[in-house]
A protein has these predicted regions:
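Alpha-helical transmembrane segments and their immediate juxtamembrane cytosolic regions
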Residues: 10-11, 15-360
Length: 360
């Protein structure tokens, strides 16, 4: 993502390079598995801390964990943005191979059907129009359809490209995102969800939505220009170090001048955290996360369905164990672990149904 030199790549050479090294892309599947588990644990903790509106609240006040908001804050800063980046990364090649008609059809099947079924079920159970965690699936579907529309009028870049990811380019990217997020949060603070114009059924949190759009777009560009493949070890390691330091800064917030500073400039602070920890994790998994065991292949195949199924399974489990004392942290870990296992296993069982794999 730097505006500088290295070896020259055209898009087709990038694709050829990537396809010759498909094993190297295992790290993206493995990273998505880890992100899915993190989402599940994030939601598991919401009932036991100040994590926003949740369908279940424990009857025992001793199960409340006041410290867990740090965990929520760090997660919210980057994990959905990283999901969008990874999703965007695979969009250009899928479109080029399938063409607009097949691309749109497959997205409507794989994203639209789960959205209608799970979103409809959540709405029925909540007694109001509500899609819960399926907002991500809906947004991803909208982004993909917009991409398909844009491609009808704009040809992809196919010239020589020597750009690569550097710390300076990440600083610029994070700065643009941060400034935009800062001004958005002046009128729409974090955790404020809306339906655009009050009627469009696309629930969004404006405070984070700019991040999601930018990360999806940067994923598309990263595929076009092989930015992930060309990211140097120095850039990757430094990005991870900066991202972890910024995450640690969230955990150190506990009143005082530092807390006041981060609170005042949180849109900018969070954006830098997002950009650096995302590219740092992408580098780390590229170098150390190409696990090719049957276990990881199995988990990767179920991770999408696990994201879809986990919420309702979790709420049922939380109500079922409400009267069982495990300690606050023990209950949080128990719910997270059991929900993760059940979600992945349920997806595996559903995928045994003929043609279900086209959706899940």
């Amino acid at each position: 993502m730097r505006f500088g030199s290295s070896c020259n790549y055209s898009y087709h050479r990038c694709v050829k390079y990537i396809e010759m090294n498909k094993k190297r892309l295992l790290y993206l599947d493995n990273l998505k598995v880890c992100l899915t588990v993190l989402v599940i644990f994030h939601h598991a903790g919401q009932a036991y801390g100040d994590g926003g509106d949740w369908a279940y609240h424990p009857n025992n006040p001793a199960e409340f964990m006041p410290w867990i908001w740090h965990f929520f804050s760090v997660n919210a800063a980057f994990f959905m943005g990283l999901f969008f980046l990874i999703s965007g990364y695979f969009v250009p090649t899928s479109f080029d191979k399938q063409g607009v008609k097949v691309f749109v059809q497959k997205k409507l099947i794989r994203l639209g059907i789960p959205l209608l079924l799970m979103g409809g079920l959540i709405s029925v159970l909540s007694g109001k129009p509500e899609i819960g965690h399926m907002w991500y699936i809906e947004s991803l579907l909208v982004f993909c359809l917009i991409y398909a529309l844009v491609r009808q009028f704009c040809k992809p870049f196919d010239g020589e490209c020597s750009s690569k990811t550097t710390i300076i380019s990440l600083l610029i990217f994070g700065g643009v995102m941060g400034i935009g997020s800062y001004f958005i949060r002046q009128v729409s603070p974090q955790d404020h969800w809306i339906w655009p114009f009050g009627i469009i059924p696309l629930p969004m949190e404006p405070a984070h939505y700019l991040q999601y759009v930018m990360m999806f777009v940067i994923g598309i560009l990263a595929r076009r220009f092989a930015w992930l493949e060309k990211m140097s070890n120095t850039t990757g390691a430094l990005s991870l170090a900066i991202g972890c330091a910024l995450a640690l800064g969230i955990y150190l917030r506990d009143g005082g001048a530092w807390n006041d500073f981060v609170t005042e400039w949180f849109g900018i602070y969070e954006s830098f955290l997002c950009v650096f920890i995302c590219f740092g994790l992408l580098w780390l998994f590229r170098e150390r996360g190409n696990w090719d065991s049957k276990f990881w292949q199995w988990c990767a195949a179920q991770s999408y369905g696990a994201y879809i199924f986990h919420l309702l399974l979790m709420i049922v489990l939380q109500y079922a164990t409400d009267g069982i004392w495990m300690g606050a942290f023990g209950k949080f870990m128990f719910i997270g672990i059991i929900t993760t296992i059940c979600s992945f296993v349920l997806t595996w069982l559903v995928r045994l149904i003929p043609k279900a794999k086209k959706v899940l």
